[in-house]
């Protein structure tokens, strides 16, 4: 059996979650990973369209502003995202942070998958011919924080 740092982190987070979910159902592992998966696809669609206004209800104010700056920066350079066929292979909760010292509850999700992700000139056609060399495996960490009875995306790493 191959042990990795991430598998150890998943085990530790899982142990914490099993205790936390008994006190509050928001800590349900399945709901947390599904929320991460859902928001991932919404963010990718919004980046592809270059319009993130619909994401406000899924991101913290800080997370929304960071994403908006990224999109605005691309606009100023006449660039755009091309995101096609993203496939998630795994979503794992790797860290759990119960509320402490005026910081809200939070968790970090590791999202692994594969897809076409590239930034190109806005005026170029968005054909996928020749983009097969842009298919990449990805592994990203997203920080979520609790707001009421909901998890919001705060930071994309």
Residue map of PLM features:
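Juxtamembrane and targeting peptides
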Residues: 1-38, 42, 121
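Short, exposed beta-strand "edge-strand" segments with a Pro/Gly-rich flavor and a Y/T-containing core
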Residues: 21-27, 52-59
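Structured, amphipathic secondary-structure segments that form assembly/contact surfaces
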Residues: 38-41, 45, 53-157
């Amino acid at each position: 059996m191959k042990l990795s740092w991430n598998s150890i982190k998943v085990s530790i987070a899982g142990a914490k979650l099993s205790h936390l979910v008994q006190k509050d159902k928001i800590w349900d592992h399945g709901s947390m990973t599904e929320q991460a998966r859902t928001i991932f696809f919404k963010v990718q669609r919004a980046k592809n369209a270059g319009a993130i206004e619909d994401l406000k209800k899924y991101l913290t104010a800080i997370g929304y502003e960071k994403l908006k700056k990224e999109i605005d920066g691309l606009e100023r350079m006449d660039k755009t995202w091309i995101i096609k066929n993203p496939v998630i292979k795994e979503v794992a909760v790797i860290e759990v942070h119960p509320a402490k010292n005026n910081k809200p509850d939070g968790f970090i999700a590791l999202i692994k998958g594969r897809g076409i992700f590239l930034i190109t000139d806005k005026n170029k056609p968005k054909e996928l011919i020749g983009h097969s060399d842009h298919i990449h495996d990805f592994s990203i960490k997203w920080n979520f924080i609790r707001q009421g009875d909901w998890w919001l995306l705060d930071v994309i790493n």
